[in-house]
């Protein structure tokens, strides 16, 4: 019996078990560990759509109606890259959720068809063959300064935004906060028509618990403590006390100037309670020079923002101007200039690289328009992974040499912007991974453009954004091919396929009856018991020390010397600027 060669099989159906794929132009390779579509042994039985192909009536398409359980959409033959593994499978979507990961087709004539992936007349097909599928990005640090950032986020594969703001107000440009019931209501209403899940953070800087509770009833999903509003030990303690009762998360930007205490005082005020530490390295703010040491605390859930990812020869130069603008500083005032300069330290930025590679810093967000770029979360993450592989070699468990594959490193890094922030903020029951039962917030990538620009972005099972050519052309592919909104981005559809994450107290207060919103309000899960060990593949707790005079960083006793990268992948090969 004739058999297909592996090369020919890959040309027809995409990679299979044992094949390796390079991610964009990085040094990262992933190996497919399982093929649930069949593989060369069942060649010809794969679910493939097209003229003369498998998914036709009484062939790969069966008789099952939607009422019989047929999925609304099947993504065929995709390589799934997620924190739990790297496999090839067909993915079934129904009612906006993932219902099956396995083999699709017609069980009347095909073997091994998953019971929830029976293709019928009601089923649409998206080809994932020779493409990669990931979960949509969960950006855990977004300043809602202007609505245009949502366009940029979607075009980069972001499907969930955690943050706050009211527009280009000085408070929003600095602090990621939507303060008070009125602002929360107006922002929840204004965001209703975008095909993105939103979770707004209320202002946590107060010693008045009543002011915190009213924000939870008004639609906040949690709180943000920011030094520009005064992150005092008393405010930290009060906010966490309310959060412990409410079950919500608190994000912290601590006191850079050490006016109300040092990092040890903040750790004392936190008192072992779960907290999300924003820009843990410190360039984005926090106790100078040693806020990075909180990454060694088991109750602290540490994240980075993307402008310091990875450390390059240009990182320091661009940060000073960013700081002056974002924090409303005056370069003619010496104290303001000193404040800005105290936050930019090559040694801690370099240490941030290796702490990510070890899994000691667990998440990456954007800090959009406030010292970060909303469209570069994914790109900066993989640039960091590339730089670390070049400097540190293969991670433990990853083969090197001619059989090199970076599955462990890739799974660690993808978790930083998908499942880890979802767990930290109580959303992982709905989002954060490619798993059955979750919203079909999925991103398809061409391997050559992985992490650079998505091929298709699905929001709740509907195609919301895609790389699309000239609309007046005779076929969809003629240039210019640009990321463009699709039908799933229409306001009514977006509301039907997206949610606002809110505190459970707002559900109890019947917030939906008081808002002009069409989307569902989804209560966040209780996160008060979430610690670093709950963040998959990113739970390392090394010893971290910072010399207060030289800013030298020791990780498990070893000095990590800055070696800023002079060249990166995913840059001028893809972008003009």
From Swiss-Prot:
Lineage: Bacteria, Bacillati, Actinomycetota, Actinomycetes, Mycobacteriales
Pathway: Nitrogen metabolism; urea degradation; CO(2) and NH(3) from urea (urease route): step 1/1
Modified residues (N6-carboxylysine): 224
EC number: 3.5.1.5
Record localization: Cytoplasm
Residues involved in Ni(2+) 2 binding: 224, 253, 279
A cellular-component GO term for this protein: cytoplasm
Descriptive protein name: Urease subunit alpha
Recorded effect of pH on activity: Optimum pH is 7.2.
Cofactor: record remark: Binds 2 nickel ions per subunit.
